[in-house]
Amino acid sequence: MQREALTGNLVITTVAGLVMGRVGKLQRVFLEEAVAAADVVFYDECDRVQKNLDDLFTPATEFNMFINECAEPVSQFMLETNTRRLGNLASAYYAELQAKSPTVLQCVSNAVKAAKNSENGSVLANTFSAYTLLDSIVDEISEATVKEIYRLMDFQTAEMSSLFDIMSRSCESIRSDRFEQLLAEWLDRREPQLKNNEKKIAVRKKIQLIITLIFFDRFVMEIGTAYEDSQDVTMGYNELVGFIRTRFTAQQDYLPSALMGNLFGIKLTSEDDILLFRQYAYGRALLTDLPYLRVNKEGVPIGPHVVLLSGSSYAKGSYEYHVNADVNYIVEADRSVREFIGNTQFMELGLAERVSGSPLENRDAVLRDVVDRCTAYIISELSDKKGKILLVVNSFSQAETVADRLRANFVKRGCREEVCALISDKNIEKKDFSQYIRRGEVYKFDQKKARILVAPALAIERGHNIVDEQGHSSLSSVFFLIRPMGVPDDVKERSIKMNGYMASKLFEYKENDLYQKNLYVRQEATKFWNRMNYSAKRRLDYLCDKEIKRDLVSTMFVLILQIFGRLCRVTDASKETPTVYFADGAFRKKIDAEDGFDALNEMYDYLKDMLSDEEHGEIARTLYEPFFTAYEGGIRHE
């Protein structure tokens, strides 16, 4: 395969294959070969490719996943004879670090929570690092203390810091009394104004957290080094080591750096885990700027030509999916297909139950209530139509919850139809594949006896088509049991949105001075990152930032459109037209609220504005007018 990639006239690959694949005897990164030798690069579904490129250069991993992965190899190591363990000290040290990891995670989590509780968590509500925390208190402590902490952060000078031995005790045990005592004594000498001052407790707790985070950063790096030194391959290769080892060195030679610099940070998850993430580069440049990533001596671009293909990449305002490139050609669907789509029935069920936005601990219960309310409509659809039905949720676990509830409801009503839940390709536990289908095999759903598929929005929006032997969609109806939106505080998604925001700004940027442009990028990216952090704390009903709100609405539209596209694979326009049900009550604002986030109304306004735009409306009308015609006819709008 590697030889063919170098000699073939046509190479078909994935995003990861293009960026990270290696070819030839020298194992050269395939991206280098493509930039140097390819005449043209076609990107299919370029809006999704754009998102995947940004995602690829923002690796993230949960520390507890590393701990879970360590369980078996560490157990095997402990079952060895002492002679065998002594025979490979490098592997023994790696095992020591692995075994110590649960204690370190508990200590870091406790330090984060202690700092959060002392100041209502404003700085710690989102992503943070030792640097950002120190910056937040720099005006409240002496310059000498700031310099001492910076000395501790620097790997070259850390051991010369008077805080080094104290830091070494920070994650020694979950009983942190000794560490806290030593640090308190140090602070009493250096920062007497903090002593016995109730108003300064938050500052002391932040310093304690900063010292703990510095230790944690060193500990994570030490794990990577220990793995490299270990010669025992049975100790395993895991996600954390992959996270540490990933440098994208060759790729960064071509790409602009991350917009805020090579960002590194951590985040405390809802399960008290620590999420680590980095952003290495501006990934979408490989999509929109590939011809300019290789130039001759005169500065003329000589990189590959690029053809971008997608039916949903023109969605202004969506920082994930809108591709900031001029549209040169539109392949318009046949009139009969446009009419078929325009005759779709859109219906909202008007349920009071609100799945999206409900407390996590109650969400499954609310989802089951929605399934109960929808069961009669589902049975009616099965009776009235020959096609199959898609039920859309937000996760694989929700898919199982819905499938189980619907099966139980069918039994009560004497309905013999079968229900199939989509599961991850990584899931190895499910055995009864009459009730489950893997994501990578979803195209086979047409061959299954089951007429109902329950699937997460992000798992079903793209990829394999579910069609009959004639290529016509097997699906005739879709029920949105949830409001399809991303996770508000997902750091990878936030990085993608930041890239998209700046791409939209730079598309219209006219300043030629490179220094001023770079300064503008850093400043605007940082401001927008902070805006996202601030908006993430607010409920949608109270979201005031118009650009972030428009991004949410436009991105939701693209997701709904792509899922709807599963029903619009049309080869026979005489067949039954699709029906789309909005079941989640959260698609509308609360009944008793004068103001609030009304997703269906917001989406109507967004589409109407885009289609009526004087300059680019023709593009939007060609792509989306059939959808809008059907939507406008079935959904109430104000």
Language-model features: locations:
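Short, basic/hydrophobic alpha-helical segments
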Residues: 368-384, 440-445, 570
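Glycine-rich phosphate-binding "P-loop"
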Residues: 278, 334-373
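N-terminal targeting/trafficking signals and adjacent low-complexity tails
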Residues: 504-544, 554, 582-638
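Conserved motor-coupling elements within RecA-like helicase/translocase cores
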Residues: 2-11, 415-455, 466-469
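Signature of the SF2 helicase/ATPase Hel1-core->accessory helical subdomain module
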Residues: 2-7, 13-223, 278-279, 301, ...
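Conserved strand-helix element at the start of the C-terminal RecA-like helicase core
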Residues: 381-407
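Conserved helicase/translocase P-loop NTPase motor core
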Residues: 2-37, 49-53, 237-300, 453-456
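Long insertion/accessory domains within large nucleic-acid-processing enzymes
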Residues: 446-447, 457-459, 500-503, 538-551
